Amino acid sequence: MPKMKTKKSASKRFTARPGGTIKRGQAFKRHILTKKTTKNKRQLRGTEGVHETNLKSVRAMMPYA
């Protein structure tokens, strides 16, 4: 049986952590930043865990992560 391919778009967006969790970047910080407050932009800086409802589909896209 051939190897499963990793979806490259998913591997660029998500990172797998040793504990089994998958991290993702925050949305809403690419453009139209002038109307967003400094506090809002600062809070969007970090990474966040993928929600449990999306975890199964993200793991299917990254079989070796």
Swiss-Prot record:
One of its GO terms (biological process) is translation. GO terms for cellular component: cytosolic large ribosomal subunit. The keyword Phosphoprotein does not apply. GO terms for molecular function: structural constituent of ribosome. Residues 1-15, 26-44 have a biased composition (Basic residues). InterPro entries: Ribosomal_bL35, Ribosomal_bL35-like, Ribosomal_bL35_CS, Ribosomal_bL35_sf. It comes from the Bacteria. Residues 1-65 are annotated as: Disordered. The keyword Coiled coil does not apply. Keywords: Ribonucleoprotein, Ribosomal protein. Pfam families: Ribosomal_L35p. Belongs to the bacterial ribosomal protein bL35 family. NCBIfam families: rpmI_bact. This is Large ribosomal subunit protein bL35. The lineage of its organism: Bacteria, Pseudomonadati, Pseudomonadota, Betaproteobacteria, Burkholderiales.
